[in-house]
Swiss-Prot record:
Name of the protein described by the UniProt record: Low-density lipoprotein receptor class A domain-containing protein 4
Lineage: Eukaryota, Metazoa, Chordata, Craniata, Vertebrata
Native organism: Homo sapiens (Human)
Function, in words: Functions as a negative regulator of TGF-beta signaling and thereby probably plays a role in cell proliferation, differentiation, apoptosis, motility, extracellular matrix production and immunosuppression. In the canonical TGF-beta pathway, ZFYVE9/SARA recruits the intracellular signal transducer and transcriptional modulators SMAD2 and SMAD3 to the TGF-beta receptor. Phosphorylated by the receptor, SMAD2 and SMAD3 then form a heteromeric complex with SMAD4 that translocates to the nucleus to regulate transcription.
Domain LDL-receptor class A: 16-48
Annotated spans, Disordered: 286-306
Pfam families the UniProt entry points to: Ldl_recept_a (PF00057)
Length: 306
């Protein structure tokens, strides 16, 4: 019995594997069991069928480093987002608060800086370069120029605009019964004195179609100009046709037809008729024996000679 107990004790105390460090492994199952039982991993070096693995402490350190990097990145992104949101809300709130103050300051500054369109009773009308509004120096830093124009356009009147840019024809006051002349632009428009206008109105009176009157003025004008006969200076004279011997036939044309075909003939005719009338009176005084002069007036009849 004592011998059997001694053998069992030797079996448990017998060294099965001696590590490189001198440590003894009493169990054979501790060798090549994928665990570092020796402490220097010498019990796993000569294992042919089992792949060597690093100690588990290396994996734990790498995992902790990756977790630290991820946490730092997430915290940094959150801080940046929060700062951007706070800055945005701060700027929008400041602009919302300053907008009523700016509009009120602009309304108060309009009568102080000068009205864009002053009334005639307050001051004489300024030129185009003097009525432009110059913004205040402090407004240049509040908003860009296009935003200032957009905001300031609400206070500008829609009319009147700069009046030298509006090209309108001149206004002519006509009396009752007058026919306005055909407008052909400011270059060809001619204003007449009252005497010429009354004479032109008498010339435009339409005569009976069966009357034929000799007119020495028309003969002289036709021979001088060589063109179509202008309207007669006598009441009831036809100017539609003119023969070589000075006989006028047919109804006279209307004023609009004459002015449409010959816009400058009326004014030229008045000058020439006045010149011929003066020369005719002088010739009548010199040769008062047998001069034929047509009589103007309401009592004149065809064939009355002086």
């Amino acid at each position: 019995m004592p011998e059997a107990g001694f053998q069992a004790t030797n079996a448990f105390t017998e060294c099965k594997f001696t590590c490189t460090s001198g440590k003894c492994l009493y169990l054979g199952s501790l060798v090549c069991n994928q665990q570092n039982d020796c402490g220097d991993n010498s019990d796993e070096e000569n294992c042919l069928l089992v792949t060597e693995h690093p100690p588990p402490g290396i994996f734990n350190s790498e995992l902790e480093f990756a977790q630290i990097i991820i946490i730092v990145v997430v915290v940094t992104v959150m801080v940046v987002v929060i700062v951007c949101l706070l800055n945005h809300y701060k700027v929008s709130t400041r602009s919302f608060i300053n907008r009523p103050n700016q509009s009120r300051r602009r309304e108060d500054g309009l009568p102080q800086e000068g009205c864009l369109w002053p009334s005639d009773s307050a001051a004489p009308r300024l030129g185009a370069s003097e009525i432009m509004h110059a913004p205040r120096s402090r407004d240049r830093f509040t908003a860009p120029s296009f935003i200032q124009r957009d905001r300031f356009s609400r206070f500008q009147p829609t009319y009147p605009y700069v009046q030298h840019e509006i090209d309108l024809p001149p206004t002519i006051s006509l009396s009752d019964g007058e026919e306005p002349p055909p407008y052909q632009g400011p270059c060809t428009l001619q204003l007449r004195d009252p005497e010429q206008q009354m004479e032109l109105n008498r010339e435009s009176v339409r005569a009976p179609p069966n009357r034929t009157i000799f007119d020495s003025d028309l003969i002289d004008i036709a021979m001088y100009s060589g063109g179509p006969c202008p309207p007669s200076s006598n009441s009831g004279i036809s100017a539609s046709t003119c023969s070589s011997n000075g006989r006028m036939e047919g109804p006279p044309p209307t004023y609009s037809e004459v002015m449409g075909h010959h816009p400058g003939a009326s004014f030229l005719h008045h000058q020439r008729s006045n010149a011929h009338r003066g020369s005719r009176l002088q010739f009548q005084q010199n040769n008062a024996e047998s001069t034929i002069v047509p009589i103007k007036g309401k009592d004149r009849k065809p064939g009355n000679l002086v």
